[in-house]
């Protein structure tokens, strides 16, 4: 009865199932299953094989007993649905799931060979024989290996035939290097089927020790120059940087540092030659300077005794008119050098200083240069001399470094202290610790009226409002 139902439903008439309507669209990307000429009994056996496997999916669980008519009807309906979906007995050219030809007998069902995964674990294999005993063998118990695992290799081979390898490289091939530590030498050179993890031409071509690059089109690189660099994580970089070991410091210029004109790119970086410092011992860097950087022998420059005498005379060189005159006179100008006077060269100035640093600071007044900047918040004042900057910083900090030895008054500037001390030693001075006021005699006015010497010793500076004493409780803003 089940075979008759399968033959009736598997007729070439159009099926009402939705899956059969779209079965032709499923079969476009697959090789069509070319069905051999078989009798209606083979078709019935094929459908019976599918029907016997349906209880494994729970379609009709009562079909194992074979006694209930309702179970038989349900199994027949399910077999009809599956046979209609898989084109069991239908049009032989549009099987959507026939991936590979089974290579078995012509009467055997393709579902029994390739898709016997539909078998129930308890059934003995109604689709294995293929002929007509699919429904009767449903009650037999036999040990059966999982068929899905056994069919993996056949399915993969069929998929390789259906989907040939595309010409474009896999997106992971660009970063997957042949020098990966996880790869063995045998795996890279194996002649198996090409897979996505095969090493292709990436951003670094594997090079052999003699510098020959591997072919970019080959998927399996040659094992000759590759196996030597497999066990090193930086094997692909060996030939690129093999010439950098001693070429930059060798006798000849290396090829990678030569410009197209043939000039070495490091010719501008000359070493310090020993001729500039005749009193010092020749350094090994200067001795090897020609061969290391310049490409030729280092020629020592002869320095004039005049410049060496100026450089190592024990003092800094000076270009003031007095020093230039002493150099012009030679030995006769020893008296000028002994005086050590440095005059300003600006016409009409005529100031003379005993130190060259003082002369340089004086020349900044003429040029207007003020290199010393106050870094106090929102100040930014610039000064010509560093001592002026230090004096200015005390106005921000409120520091009074200089104290009077008589009255213990403190001052920010040393010249203010010296003026204050003169008031104690003067004829009209108070002379006592509390006599801070000026005397009526000559020299009674002391120093500057605007500086801090008139203030008490512990008074806060004007720039520190947080140090001001709190107002008295009985006064408010100076008013009673």
From Swiss-Prot:
Entry GO MF terms: DNA-binding transcription factor activity, RNA polymerase II-specific; RNA polymerase II cis-regulatory region sequence-specific DNA binding; zinc ion binding
Where found, per UniProt? Nucleus
Q: Where are the zinc fingers (C2H2-type)?
A: 342-366, 372-396, 402-424
Positions the record marks as coiled coil are: none
One Gene Ontology term of the biological-process aspect is: regulation of transcription by RNA polymerase II
- Please note every region of biased composition (Gly residues): 287-297, 426-445
Please provide one cellular component term from the Gene Ontology annotations of this protein. nucleus
Q: Where is the composition biased (Low complexity)?
A: 16-25, 298-307
Coarsely, its chief localization is nucleus
Q: Where is this motif: 9aaTAD?
A: 194-202
Source taxon at top rank: Eukaryota
Q: Does the keyword Disulfide bond apply?
A: no
Q: Which UniProt keywords apply?
A: DNA-binding, Metal-binding, Nucleus, Repeat, Transcription, Transcription regulation, Zinc, Zinc-finger
Spans annotated as Disordered: 1-44, 280-308, 416-480
Which family is it part of?
Belongs to the Sp1 C2H2-type zinc-finger protein family.
UniProt comment concerning the protein's domains: The 9aaTAD motif is a transactivation domain present in a large number of yeast and animal transcription factors.
Q: What does this protein do?
A: Transcription factor which plays a key role in limb development. Positively regulates FGF8 expression in the apical ectodermal ridge (AER) and contributes to limb outgrowth in embryos.
Know the name of this protein?
Transcription factor Sp8
């Amino acid at each position: 009865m089940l075979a008759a139902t399968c033959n009736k439903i598997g007729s070439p008439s159009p099926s009402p199932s939705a899956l059969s309507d779209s079965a032709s669209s499923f079969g476009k990307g697959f090789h069509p299953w070319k069905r051999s000429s078989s009798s209606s009994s083979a078709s019935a056996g094929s459908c019976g094989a599918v029907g016997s496997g349906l209880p494994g999916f729970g379609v009709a669980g009562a079909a194992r007993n074979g006694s209930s008519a309702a179970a038989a009807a349900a199994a027949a309906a399910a077999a009809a649905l599956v046979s209609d979906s898989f084109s069991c007995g239908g049009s032989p050219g549009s099987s959507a799931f026939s991936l590979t030809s089974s290579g078995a007998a012509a009467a055997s069902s393709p579902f029994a060979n390739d898709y016997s995964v539909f078998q129930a674990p308890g059934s003995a294999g109604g689709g294995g024989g293929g002929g007509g005993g699919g429904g009767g063998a449903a009650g037999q118990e036999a040990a059966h290996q999982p068929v899905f695992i056994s069919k993996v290799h056949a399915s993969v081979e069929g998929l390789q035939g259906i989907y040939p390898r595309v010409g474009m490289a896999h997106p992971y091939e660009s970063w997957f290097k042949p020098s990966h530590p996880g790869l063995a030498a045998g795996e890279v050179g194996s002649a198996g089927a090409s897979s996505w993890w095969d090493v292709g031409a990436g951003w670094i071509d594997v090079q052999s020790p003699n510098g020959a690059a591997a072919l970019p089109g080959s998927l399996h690189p040659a094992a000759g120059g590759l196996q030597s660099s497999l066990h090193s994580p930086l094997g692909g970089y060996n030939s690129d940087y093999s010439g950098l070991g001693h070429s930059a410091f060798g006798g000849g210029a290396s090829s990678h540092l030569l410009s197209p004109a043939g000039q070495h790119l490091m010719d501008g970086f000359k070493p310090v030659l020993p001729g500039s410092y005749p009193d010092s011992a020749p350094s090994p860097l200067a001795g090897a300077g020609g061969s290391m950087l310049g490409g030729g022998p280092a020629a020592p420059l002869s320095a004039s005794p005049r410049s060496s005498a100026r450089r190592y005379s024990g003092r800094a060189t000076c270009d003031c008119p007095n020093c230039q005159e002493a150099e012009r006179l030679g030995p006769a100008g020893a008296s000028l050098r002994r005086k050590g006077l440095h005059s300003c060269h600006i016409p009409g100035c005529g100031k003379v200083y005993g130190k060259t640093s003082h002369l340089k600071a004086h020349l900044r007044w003429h040029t207007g240069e003020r290199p010393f900047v106050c870094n106090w918040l929102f100040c930014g004042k610039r000064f010509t001399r560093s001592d002026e900057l230090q004096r200015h910083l005390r106005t921000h900090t409120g520091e009074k470094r200089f104290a009077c030895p008589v009255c213990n008054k403190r001052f920010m500037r040393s010249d203010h202290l010296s003026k204050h001390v003169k008031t104690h030693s003067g004829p009209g001075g108070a002379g006592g610790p509390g006599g801070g006021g000026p005397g009526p005699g000559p020299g009674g006015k002391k120093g500057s009226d605007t500086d801090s010497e008139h203030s008490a010793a512990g008074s806060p500076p004007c720039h520190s409002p947080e140090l001001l004493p709190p107002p008295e409780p009985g006064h408010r803003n100076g008013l009673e």
